[in-house]
């Protein structure tokens, strides 16, 4: 053939080798165009076409750069047109060719040049390699039933000639189970020895994989047969046991427990009734399993089992002081509680509820109380509980039913008088499954919990000997539940307390945990102070402990990595080398006095926070807008502050002339954090006055307190936490409601020394201390 250019067809999923006849389904537009452009050769009255593999399988319309240059010159033996504008062709690969000058138009077209195979120099060696490959292929064909018998027959016919090694290699290559890339490499390889070597390697791998798969199938089949055999024998054993009445031994154990346990009268009658039903049932029935589970649960509870606890308030006080620094008032109330129990265990004291921010030691206090009482400790976390069945249990008629967590904890620790922590009691919620807070009322009421009935047991269980202690972060508890508990407030730690806790508790704890020797690492007091000030911002010490843990890990890594380092000393100078840049600013208030910007004080679940309140005025309709994700209470405080300002505008030298011509926008930054509460009135009022009179607010002054429309300042809560936040934030003066002066006795002396605390009773006093100067009555209208 003298043609130098032919239509070119791209193949998705096959590589054709010379001498091989292969069917091809044609459906893509370019491929059909290429097929239609084939012409009959003058030499042998046949049609020819070029075929090559595309580089990416999922390419619907590959470009000429996405085709391999080594292709096949193929003779078209047959064309069969199919429905949906597709066709099936049968081709015979004539020769391997090198493509050039590929044209990418409606159809591919390319020039070609035939690539001959290299000469076989060692015929004897080649014959050995081919024989080896054919034997391997025969073995593979025996293992893999997918190989067509006609292929084996074709190979055997070629082998009989013993001369056309190239044809044998091509046939074997076309039927290898390997990647398209590997087959393309085989096509491109002109050295017959290298090609047959690759074929042998691939066939060997295929045989190993086939044998492994076959062995795995055999193993799975044997396992299935064994499982079926075991099941059959197990069922036979059950039938034999039924005939021999061997189940009687298990029933006898249940009956023995019913008689020996100190069950209540009601529980014993219920157990005997259920046992009679169980004995009369078919032991293979589903109802039998339900009854058996019920009896096992009922009899596994610690009926009449109590720890011999002996309360010694002196020892309890030592334990509390050993495990906790500070918290004097809290410890005092706990000792009073234990003193009452020591004198008379029959007195039903109140349920304690420890309320405070995270990390202040609520959970560890409860553990210390349990140790001081000589009782076991157990914990029931209520965070996220929204199903009352978690408390009361599910009725046994339900599939997979079980008792509630209260009895579940007693079953676990095997005593009826533990100290039980009800953790995160403020995090419960209710939905269509009921209200768990209402279910807790019976548990926490001393008049009712001696007759607690779990839905699963359906008999009374005495919880009056359990010491329940709850913890919460927020005061926001259901009224009925709150009424049954005595709330003990645990405020955040001051800097000095955190320092002592870190030195005496946290650092030794981390050194012990990480197996640090005393002479390996030292952390200076200055470094701990910097940790508290610049790497944590919390009321508790949980984050401080994490930072100390990170510090210990990094120092230990240096010691182990560098054998010459025997001791590491950490102080404020090299602290950043271990923990990186400082995370927070400490003692930095605003740099300048601002107009329309005031610092308020907030009390959140995690302690006190500084709250910046800012405002702007602009042309509008006389409306007031609030942003910053404010709650309803805070929005109403803003409205009240604005109304109070309007009523006193003439006192500040402003007229009523143009209020309807502008809007006031009040914003509290950190808009992603919800903010609410009745203590921002003073700050809101001061912000508005500063904005309208253009008088700056002292940058070192913060304030807290709600106001009335008449300008009176109302008391607030969380005073200690707010003063701690002011001290951390570099505030010098704090304005507090006059009615909160009585709470100053609970404030640590060092906080009161660092702050100038001024009590105020009305907004005039607030403005006197907050503004740079008092507004003068000039009788002017506000000018934008």
Curated annotation (Swiss-Prot):
UniProt-listed InterPro entries: AAA+_ATPase, ATPase_AAA_core, Lon_bac, Lon_bac/euk-typ, Lon_lid, Lon_proteolytic, Lon_Prtase, Lon_prtase_N
Enzyme class per UniProt: hydrolase
Active-site residues, Swiss-Prot/TrEMBL: 679, 722
The organism's place on the tree of life at top rank: Bacteria
Lon proteolytic domain mapped to chain residues: 592-773
Induction text: By heat shock.
Membrane-traversing stretches: none
Protein name per its UniProtKB record: Lon protease
Source organism of this protein record: Rickettsia prowazekii (strain Madrid E)
Designated gene of the protein: lon
């Amino acid at each position: 053939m003298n043609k130098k250019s032919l239509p070119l067809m791209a193949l998705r999923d096959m590589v054709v080798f010379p001498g091989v006849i292969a069917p091809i389904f044609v459906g893509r537009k370019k491929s059909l165009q290429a097929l239609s452009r084939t012409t009959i050769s003058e030499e042998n009255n046949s049609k020819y076409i070029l075929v090559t593999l595309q580089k990416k399988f999922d390419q619907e319309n590959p470009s000429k750069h996405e085709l391999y240059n080594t292709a096949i010159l193929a003779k078209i033996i047959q064309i069969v047109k199919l429905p949906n504008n597709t066709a099936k062709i049968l081709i015979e690969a004539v020769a391997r060719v090198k493509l050039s000058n590929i044209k990418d138009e409606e159809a591919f077209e390319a020039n070609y040049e035939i690539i001959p195979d290299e000469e076989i120099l060692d015929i004897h060696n080649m014959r050995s390699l081919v024989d080896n490959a054919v034997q391997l292929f025969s073995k593979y064909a025996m293992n893999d039933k997918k190989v067509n018998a006609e292929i084996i027959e074709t190979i055997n016919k070629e082998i009989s000639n013993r001369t056309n090694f190239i044809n044998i290699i091509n046939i074997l290559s076309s039927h290898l189970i390997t990647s398209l890339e590997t087959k393309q490499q085989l096509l491109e390889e002109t050295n017959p020895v290298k090609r047959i070597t690759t074929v042998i390697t691939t066939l060997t791998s295929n045989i190993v994989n086939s044998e492994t798969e076959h062995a795995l199938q055999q193993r799975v089949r044997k396992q299935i047969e064994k499982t079926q055999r075991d099941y059959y024998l197990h069922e036979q054993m059950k039938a034999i046991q039924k005939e021999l009445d061997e189940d009687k031994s298990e029933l006898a154990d249940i009956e023995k427990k019913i008689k020996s346990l100190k069950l209540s009268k009601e529980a014993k009658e219920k157990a005997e009734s259920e046992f009679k039903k169980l004995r009369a049932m078919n032991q293979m029935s589903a109802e039998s399993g339900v009854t058996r589970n019920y009896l096992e649960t009922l009899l596994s509870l610690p009926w009449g089992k109590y720890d011999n606890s002996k309360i010694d308030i002196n020892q309890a006080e030592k334990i509390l002081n050993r495990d906790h620094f500070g918290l004097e008032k809290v410890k005092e109330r706990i000792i009073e509680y234990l003193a009452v129990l020591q004198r008379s265990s029959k007195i039903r004291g109140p349920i304690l509820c420890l309320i405070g921010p995270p990390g202040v030691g609520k959970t560890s206090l409860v553990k210390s109380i349990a140790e001081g009482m000589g009782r076991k400790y157990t914990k029931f976390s209520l965070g996220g509980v929204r199903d009352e069945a978690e408390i009361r249990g599910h009725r046994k008629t339900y599939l997979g039913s079980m008792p509630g967590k209260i009895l579940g904890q007693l079953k676990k620790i095997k005593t009826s008088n533990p100290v039980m922590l009800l953790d995160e009691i403020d995090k419960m919620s209710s939905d269509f499954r009921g209200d768990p807070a209402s279910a807790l009322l019976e548990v926490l009421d001393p008049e009712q919990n001696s007759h607690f009935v779990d839905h699963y047991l359906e008999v009374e269980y005495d919880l009056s000997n359990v010491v329940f202690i709850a913890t919460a972060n927020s005061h926001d508890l259901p009224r009925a539940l709150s009424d049954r508990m005595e709330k003990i407030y645990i405020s955040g730690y001051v800097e000095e307390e955190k320092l002592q806790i870190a030195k005496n508790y946290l650092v030794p704890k981390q050194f012990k945990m990480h197996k640090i020797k005393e002479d390996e690492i030292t952390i200076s007091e200055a470094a701990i102070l910097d940790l508290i000030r610049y790497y944590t911002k919390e009321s508790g010490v949980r984050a401080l402990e994490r930072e100390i843990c990170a510090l210990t890990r990094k120092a230990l890594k240096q010691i182990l990595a560098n054998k010459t380092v025997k001791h590491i000393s950490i102080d404020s100078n090299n602290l950043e080398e271990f923990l990186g840049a400082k995370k927070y600013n400490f003692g930095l208030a605003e740099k300048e006095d601002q107009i329309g910007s005031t610092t308020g004080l907030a009390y959140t679940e995690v302690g006190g926070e500084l709250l910046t309140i800012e405002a702007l005025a602009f042309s509008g309709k006389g409306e007031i807008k609030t942003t910053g994700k404010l709650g309803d209470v805070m929005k109403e405080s803003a409205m009240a502050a604005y109304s109070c300002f309007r009523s006193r505008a003439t006192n500040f030298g402003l007229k009523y002339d143009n209020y309807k011509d502008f809007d006031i926008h009040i914003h509290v930054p950190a808009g992603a954090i919800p903010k609410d509460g009745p203590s921002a009135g003073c700050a809101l009022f001061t912000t508005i006055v500063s904005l309208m009179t253009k008088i700056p607010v002292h940058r070192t002054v913060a304030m807290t307190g709600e106001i009335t429309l008449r300008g009176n300042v109302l008391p607030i809560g969380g005073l200690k936490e707010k003063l701690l936040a002011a001290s951390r934030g570099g505030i010098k003066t704090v304005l507090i409601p006059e009615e909160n002066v009585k709470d100053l006795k609970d404030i640590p002396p060092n906080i009161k020394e660092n702050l100038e605390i001024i009590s105020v009773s009305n907004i005039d006093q607030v403005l006197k201390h907050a503004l740079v100067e008092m507004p003068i009555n000039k009788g002017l209208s506000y000018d934008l």
